[in-house]
Amino acid sequence: MTTYPIVQATKPLNWQAIAQIAVHDNGEPLLVLSLCSRIQLIPTYFNQHISGAINALVLRQTVAKKLQHAATLLPDTLGLVVFDGWRPLCVQQALRDEIRQQIVAKHPKADEVWIEARLDEFVANPNRHDMCPPHLTGGSVDVSLFHRATGEVLDMGSAFDEAGHLSYTAALENETDARLDAARQHRRILVGAMVQAGFTNIPTEWWHFDFGNQNWAYFSGADRAIYGAAHWQD
């Protein structure tokens, strides 16, 4: 059985530090991802009827190429399923509101400061004036794995967009429950391929990867971001 490197915990997500990184947008265009045998497309927020979500998955040109490369680094039986890419501010706000409801439902006695801190772990604040949300740049992509023979999306140990500790990318490395063994392996495969293709991952979401934006610069050590806010027109 092939073994894959464990998922190492990265430095903590720090929006204040990320916001300080300079942006020199290179003007690279957005493009619509195309379906292929190694990449499955599920425009999740459009399917959930979130107002403003588009029926397409859109990324910067280089990000799309790197995603295609990442798919070739997977075992032959697996492919990448893409849930989201470029995202307008109205959808970002809708998602922040939805995640807030999840957190409040689980922690009804929590105060506002604690809730906001938890929110920042799982969804960027669209109302910040010192930076744009990563998905608005076209440099962020949300992905998982699927089995090419069946089309089945693989178990990753927590659901996409689930706001909880098991969604932390490295969380399963410390879990002893045998039921999570397969999911742990799946995360190792996903993270390994995406990082090898040039992406960085935020530590609070196993599904979220970046290239070219401030998140990527922060986690990769680059001195600047090459993608700022991008705008899409059908």
Locate each region found by the language model.
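Extracytoplasmic cell-surface/polysaccharide-interacting catalytic and binding patches
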Residues: 1-85, 89-203, 216-234
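Conserved metal-phosphate-binding beta-hairpin within the catalytic cores
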Residues: 209
